[in-house]
């Protein structure tokens, strides 16, 4: 069984093109060394289907049985990455192949790289497949919802081991270029099967890679070669468009650079993009304006729950100039009546979540206006999911959510399943610790439906979760989608 699965793993590498046929013996010997095995017996695997997840499971069980690793998801993930490293081409080979294909066409290069990132098990397809995904109609278009299940939950043993592990500042964070080839440790994932594409944006060295958790098609991360903090400035817009010019089929956006309205990693300058059209990109402009000195740029308010200005034009340099002008104006903008304060007690509040894309021959720059002010009533943020929705979403509204994709916590999968049972069988929701937090939310929609049945209950819950996410996005909008809110928005635009 052991030798059979070693052979299957090598065959998988050949079948996917990770290794050539001429490296069969070499790769076999590398895998044997990882197991401390001196012997090898050839077996016949012809006609057998090779499923990577199954092959790795057998080999991981063998590693546990041999006492090489502890039987926990953290150690298993570290070890199977070590196994996959035996099948990986060197970074230089991957970069050369990418460059060769890029000469033909950028799409061919990214297709090759995206497939490699999955075949290598850096993107664990079998975990990503577990994510729950659905769409919901909203007043702003079709919203995407996903419950992320591909990030493994750490077990108590690994958490305890991580506390005892000696501190290491290498790599400095999960986005540093030093992750490429890193063996990992109990509190840092292994990245031996990871390959980074070096690119140049704004005349500086950056890296291009895919997210291991792919929230949407070809979800990529573009990060600074230096460990330097997030900062939204004019140079940000230059970098975004430099990337879009390299890969015109991809959009690229940045999280905001302030807490509450920013992403989870503010310590390392990075962007996220991909080959996907979000609801926000499809949303039309509800009204257009002319900005003095920028008459050649189309500017409009996007029909979207967050406060978004869209700039359109054939010359990206003009969008960059106008984007910088709007950013500067917004950073210093206060309108007490609209409850917008540029700063309180010296702490700045206004920033922007920008997204760049190319549509045909036209460049677009979407600027979502953000503000992170807090009050006693809303201690986590006035323009942040309000407390009544925290049963569904209380995390920051980052770039991905801004564009119309809800990334919801894994706990919701089980909670929705329990809720479904309670609704169908008319049980008391507040009697169950796991779902009592949803009781008042359920009462807001219970009366809208004649009956909850096993056939309709899950689609009802999915729809209602989508409605909550739309409300959450409205909470994050600085200028509301009301006549009054639109007047406040136009008041800001007039200052430009």
Task: Show where each model-derived region lies.
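Active-site microenvironments that recognize anionic phosphate/pyrophosphate groups
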Residues: 1-229, 303-305, 319-320, 329-405, ...
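Helical scaffold of the NTase/Pol beta-like nucleotidyltransferase catalytic core
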Residues: 193-197, 227-252
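Coil-to-beta-strand transition motifs
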Residues: 215-217, 249, 264-266, 279, ...
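Catalytic or ion-translocation cores adjacent to nucleophile or general acid/base/metal-coordination motifs
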Residues: 235, 244-264, 273-334
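Beta-rich nucleic-acid/ligand-interaction surfaces
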Residues: 259-267, 345-351
